[in-house]
């Protein structure tokens, strides 16, 4: 299993559009992908789970990937967060 911590730096945090991008990116990979906030772990391929994290700007999340393409999945998700979900803010 590969993990990496990221900090949400886009202005609105993990709102609906950002959550949708995260879920669709996670779904591109065979590996299981989880996102952890504090003690809450959710499936990153579940829009409801991701939205339930209610993560505002500045929140630190841990992304966990396990499976045959875990390296690629983790790299893609970390890049998405670091790119502010393409929002340019």
Each model region followed by its residue ranges:
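C-terminal structural segments of small proteins and small subunits
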Residues: 54-89
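Extreme N-terminal starter segment of soluble prokaryotic enzymes
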Residues: 2-3
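Compact, glycine-rich, soluble single-domain proteins
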Residues: 7-57, 64, 88
């Amino acid at each position: 299993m590969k993990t990496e911590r990221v900090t949400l730096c886009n202005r609105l945090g993990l709102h609906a559009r950002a959550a949708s991008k995260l879920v669709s990116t996670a779904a591109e990979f065979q590996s299981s992908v989880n996102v952890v906030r504090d003690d809450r772990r959710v499936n990153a391929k579940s829009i409801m789970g991701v939205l339930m994290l209610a993560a505002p700007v500045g929140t630190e999340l841990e992304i966990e990937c396990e499976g045959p393409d875990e390296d690629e999945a983790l790299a893609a998700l970390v890049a998405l967060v670091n790119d502010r979900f393409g929002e340019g803010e």
